[in-house]
């Protein structure tokens, strides 16, 4: 199974690590561009970039996934599956149509509750006693409370 992974924060690293440990062929990791941080405004790589490089996975950091050149680059990777976990931006339909088999979205809440950004933070701020993860494959969803 040829996979392209898309994610940015530590939550996404946990998902990517499971894919790597399962022995899937990870063709590339897409993540947000490095951002300047701290007083020196030094560019800091995303957690996904740092992990992917330790696994010799090619890393792509496009400004936008709506750019036709980025979509062509992704098509050239010929993914069977694209796995998305906390990528950080909405993905265009043209990208969702690229994988041969499916696009899999891993979201850190039980959808539809806390859809969008920072679902774990919102669950904590709202004092939730339990939360969970939703794994969406194409149009189907699997939810598990934790």
Identify the residue ranges that each predicted region occupies.
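One-carbon transfer enzymes
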Residues: 1-145
């Amino acid at each position: 199974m040829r996979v392209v992974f898309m994610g940015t924060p530590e939550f996404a690293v946990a998902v990517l690590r499971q894919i790597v440990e399962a022995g899937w062929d990870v063709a590339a990791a897409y993540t947000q561009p490095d951002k300047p941080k701290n007083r020196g405004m030094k560019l800091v790589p995303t957690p996904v970039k740092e992990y992917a490089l330790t696994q010799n996975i090619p890393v792509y950091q496009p400004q936008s996934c709506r750019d036709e050149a980025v979509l062509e680059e992704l098509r050239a990777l010929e993914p069977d599956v694209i796995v998305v976990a906390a990528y950080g931006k909405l993905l265009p339909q043209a990208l969702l149509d690229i994988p041969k088999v499916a696009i899999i979205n891993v979201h850190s809440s039980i959808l539809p509750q806390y859809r969008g950004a920072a679902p774990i933070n919102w669950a904590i701020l709202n004092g939730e006693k339990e939360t969970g993860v939703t794994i969406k494959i194409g149009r189907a969803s699997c939810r598990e409370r934790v």
